[in-house]
Amino acid sequence: ESCTIKFVTTAETCGNQAYRRSVTLLMLKAFYDVCGEQNIDKITVEFSLSKGYYCTLKGNVKITRELLMSVKKHMTQMVFQNLPIVKSTIPTGEAIERFKKNRMPDKERLFSFRRSSMVNIYSLNGFEDYFYGYMLPSTGYLKEYKLRLYAPGFLISYPRSELKGQIPEFSDEKVFRQSLKE
């Protein structure tokens, strides 16, 4: 039977979304590995800022340029290792138990209200999290990203579809930065 195969890139919306989710999983895994999961209470992707994500970290860790360089180095190593990103479909109750065990109370609460009996969980080298939507098959595809200190948190930037798969230049939003300090 004949068919057409179309390659999807970060220049397209669906490819860009899969890349964004996958690089976020990679970043989370790197933070937990570098800092030690016992030192992290929570990493939150707060909102979109400067065409990337503004993230915060709560725990016994201070976000510094040096920490971000260590995290980026670990991310680069995992990209080089081309680790699989594995999707598992599991019962919602099991997902709740896993998030409880992994100290993710927000996700534990989220799934306690879920009506569907099954949920998709993604894992990367032993680290599990929930993402809505498709992921890339492995870390080897995640070669383009930037981490930037943006106190009190940090920014992660990634290729954008509206820029034909390029990472946007950083644009400091001074009014917003001032509101973070207040």
Label each region the model flagged:
Residues 1-18, 30, 39-50, 54-182:
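Auxiliary tRNA-acceptor-end handling modules of aminoacyl-tRNA synthetases
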Residues 23-37:
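Short amphipathic alpha-helix segments
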